[in-house]
Amino acid sequence: SGSLRQAAFKGLREDKTAAEVTQAPQAPTDVRATPQAKTTTTVKPLARSGKGKVVIAGVTISSPDKVLWPARAGHPAITKADLARYYEAAADRILPHVGDRPTSIIRAPDGITGETFFQRHAMTGSNPRLKLIDVKARSPYVAPVDVGGLVAIGQSGGLELHPWGCAPGQPEIPDQVTFDLDPDEGLAFADVIAASTVVKAKLESLDLPAFVKTTGGKGLHVVVPIKSDARSRVTWDQNKAFAKAVAEAIRADAPDRFTTTLAKK
């Protein structure tokens, strides 16, 4: 109540001065009266495509009310339509990191309380909004290239996106080096944050700007963007060798805090 939602500018009154434009008085409510035209503060319902379906970014969402995350204290349930709307709203932030890159997807078609599985390759009936990327000696991978592709992942119950660190459209050419901080079960997240600052400082001492990404779990990724043009590009083997050398150097500096051979139980 009192909040302005999804306002739209319609134009200026050319027949009056600004001082003459005032808010019209509120008419008494009459349930028998003819319904008035909707105002610009009304949120339009989602477009419908057949019984029980909605359309988001041009993608038909079946079973939009299916609960993917159950309600918990203070938080309502999150539905498949909610997930699709989130992908649509966050596309500008997500696509620079996943767009046109082979992407593995953790899917939970029946929600997080049901069965989940890891999808790397195209499956029968894959949504046409997802691009297929050929990778040498492997089956084609799927990749979102636009907002519709992200929403299509939401339609399939895709909850996590794990893109390759390659140049867009070029799976054999890395465009980043990623250091995966995978904490021991007994470590607090504050310890992981502190470790990420150590790794970031080490990289910046090598004149390599880096940034930190959350992973969806307890770990963090420290990412170094690298050039992928014809003159500067490296191979995946070179990428991995460099990452291993830096990781070993960090472990040697602080062997009580880091290991490169952690095996989770």
Where are these predicted regions, by residue range?
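Short beta-strand
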Residues: 105-108, 210-216, 259-264
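Helical (often loop-to-helix) elements that flank the catalytic cores of nucleotide-handling enzymes
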Residues: 121-138, 188-205, 224-258
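Intrinsically disordered, low-complexity regulatory tails
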Residues: 1-55, 60
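Short, conserved phosphate-binding/catalytic loop or strand-edge motifs used
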Residues: 214-224
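A residue-level signal for conserved active-site and pocket-lining positions in enzyme catalytic cores
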Residues: 2, 87, 179
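Short histidine-centered catalytic/ligand-binding loop motif
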Residues: 70-83, 180-192, 231-239
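Active-site loop/lid in soluble adenylation, ligation, and acyl-transfer enzymes
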Residues: 52-175
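Long, contiguous binding/interaction regions
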Residues: 92, 148, 155-163, 174-196, ...
